[in-house]
Amino acid sequence: MKLSDIYLELKKGYADSLLYSDLSLLVNIMEYEKDIDVMSIQSLVAGYEKSDTPTITCGIIVYNESKRIKKCLNSVKDDFNEIIVLDSYSTDDTVDIIKCDFPDVEIKYEKWKNDFSYARNKIIEYATSEWIYFIDADNLYSKENKGKIAKVARVLEFFSIDCVVSPYIEEYTGHLYSDTRRMFRLNGKVKFHGKVHEEPMNYNHSLPFNFIVNLKVYHNGYNPSENNIKSKTRRNINLTEEMLRLEPENPKWLFFFGRELHLLDKDEEAIDYLKKSINNYKKFNDQRHFIDALVLLCTLLLQRNNYVDLTLYLDILETEYPRCVDVDYFRSAILLVDMQNKLTSLSNMIDEALTDERYSAINTTKDHFKRILISLNIQLENWERVKEISGEIKNDNMKKEIKQYLANSLHNIEHVLKGIEV
């Protein structure tokens, strides 16, 4: 019986059961295809009531995180059986803060080896629980998660499901990531792979099934107002380059290398690597970062006004991901640029009409042209030109009309600004 069928049967007849409640935390339950042996739904419900909740270790790797470690640990301290911090010999107060405020947290030490997977796998070696969950020091575990992660582990353990678990991670921009792969069973089958942008994989490098779960974590590590993004990116790009040397055809590393080049303001090189990544996805079964590569490439092409290539890759994006609304965003942006170009052409045409020797039967001052020209330049946000043209108008009534229009616009803008909270 499929897990999704079990869920639907529970919803129909046992919606008040603990099993249904805990299964409801699995967001993409309909995607799990493996069959599960079931005697009866009633026996499942009864068996789950008697089942044990597995223990969970929370693992954190740190180096000089004195500004953030307290908030991070406070957010997780009550939801896990064991917390292990692996410190790479911090030179700030990170360790002192942990020892003083979190005496139950186990601290291990390991020199930094330029390999995030090595550090995470070390924590796996130290962990004594049945499951492990990883959080970063720049993450906050939502208060709304209280007790949920144990329920997730319990229900997956009950059905003997081997998988990785992904909470939602909310970025400082508000964007939610769902493919985050933070928790898995400690049965020796899963280890981290990759010196950077690491992820848990099976021992044969295949990808475990990924369950998205209804938990939320907040990530602030890439907020430019609070972090040195360039420094972090320079560290990452060196490690990504090492992974590229090891796996030169892997589109994942080509994508991340391109993304990091972009963050270092090297967009021409970034575009080349993103194109290589997209091309290589044709040869790989793992398509997870395909959409990310396409969207970033389209963004860079739009910024550089390369509409020929943008249209080409937009077609690929629309074909591969027909439900991705960003296709409409990019096509709207292209139309907006086209409209702005047409407005500019119209403005230039009127400028010529103002300076040539043809006469006007409407008004020999040609102020009526200037009225249109002002409207065009307001839309183009060419304010110096608006000021210049306004000074050339001879009709006082038209000047008053324009001044009132601008005053009303300013009033409306100020009203909007008051409603924007930052």
From Swiss-Prot:
EC number: 2.4.1.-
Keyword Transferase found: yes
Cross-referenced InterPro entries: Glyco_trans_2-like, Nucleotide-diphossugar_trans, S_glycosyl_SunS, TPR-like_helical_dom_sf
Enzyme class name: transferase
Tree of life domain: Bacteria
Gene3D superfamilies reported for this sequence: Spore Coat Polysaccharide Biosynthesis Protein SpsA, Chain A, Tetratricopeptide repeat domain
GO BP field: bacteriocin biosynthetic process; protein S-linked glycosylation via cysteine
Record keywords, A-Z: Glycosyltransferase, Transferase
An example molecular function term from Gene Ontology annotations: glycosyltransferase activity
Known function: Transfers a hexose moiety onto 'Cys-41' of bacteriocin sublancin-168 (SunA). Accepts UDP-glucose (UDP-Glc), UDP-N-acetylglucosamine (UDP-GlcNAc), UDP-galactose (UDP-Gal), UDP-xylose (UDP-Xyl) and GDP-mannose as substrate.
Similarity-based family: Belongs to the glycosyltransferase 2 family.
UniProt protein name: SPbeta prophage-derived glycosyltransferase SunS
